[in-house]
A protein has these predicted regions:
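Active-site core of glycosidic bond-cleaving carbohydrate-active enzymes
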Residues: 1-262
Length: 262
């Protein structure tokens, strides 16, 4: 029906064929990145039917059980990776952030889909996805924020994604960026983000009045940080921030992964 499994090809009995944000959004974001790099619309033409089916499936899950109000735009089912492989907590904690990450990526996917539709001359679709993204933005703020740029439950990823995805007005975004930097300071000057937000955290800061602070975060070299991995001899990105721990012990995790901005 449009689900994009998070492992392809699907292995029966091993990999569930279910829709999940970020991983599934690759069917939209990767072709769009190719188009932006090459100017060639062919990949958009080829993938457009898949993109539409995917977003229709996301919409079905978001609306499951909800007919009215903002809840029908909150994407949390059937499964979300949430703040996957963040430095804090455990998998249960990461998965628990699924409603935030799922909804933010749902909004972003609709934004990008509107731009793709425009590039392909699909004006009705362009308008449809643009309007849907606006409704999702509103739903995110109603569900997760206090109306003044502060999350009801504060964590770095919850600010990074709506900042990078332009889900707030300028004044609100400035407050969100201030709050993000406050959380980073309170965490000893370290990021505290997983797969879904780390690629965007520097941009979320730099584009919203915190350029100097973004460079401070980039140059941090104690765990968790990018340069901590370099100090430990990494030449590729790890699956977790501290696959090699301070004491030299090595965890059972990938040391060549599609993670943290790689």
């Amino acid at each position: 029906l449009g689900a994009i499994p998070f492992v392809v090809p699907v292995r029966k009995g091993v990999t569930p064929s279910i829709t999940t944000s970020c991983w599934g959004d690759s069917c939209i974001l990767v072709p769009y990145a190719i188009y932006r790099s090459t100017g060639n619309r062919e990949v958009l033409h080829q993938m457009y039917p898949v993109m539409k089916k995917y977003l229709a499936d996301v919409s079905r899950w978001a609306m499951a059980g909800f007919i009215k109000n903002h809840s029908r735009y909150i994407f949390s089912l059937p499964f979300q990776f949430g703040d996957w492989c963040a430095p804090y907590g455990n998998p249960k904690d990461w998965l628990g952030k699924g409603p935030w990450t799922g909804t933010a990526y749902y909004c972003y996917a609709c934004q990008v889909m509107s731009e793709i539709a425009e590039a392909l001359g699909e004006r009705a679709d362009c308008d449809f996805y643009r309007k849907k993204s606006e409704k999702i933005k509103k739903a995110y703020r109603i569900r997760f924020m206090d109306g003044d740029g502060t999350l009801n439950e504060e964590f770095q990823t919850g600010y990074v994604l709506p900042l990078y995805f332009k889900m707030a007005g300028q004044k609100e975004a400035e407050k969100m960026a201030d709050n993000l930097w406050k959380l980073i300071r309170e965490n000893g000057g370290h990021l505290n983000t997983g797969f879904t937000a780390t690629p965007y955290i520097l941009f979320a800061l730099a584009d919203n009045g915190h350029l100097k602070e973004a460079y401070q975060l980039l140059m941090e070299d104690t765990n968790p940080s990018w340069l901590y991995q370099v100090k430990k001899g990494a030449t590729t990105m790890w699956e977790q921030w501290d696959v090699i721990e301070e004491n030299g012990q090595v965890k059972e995790a990938s040391m060549n992964h599609y993670a943290y901005g790689a």
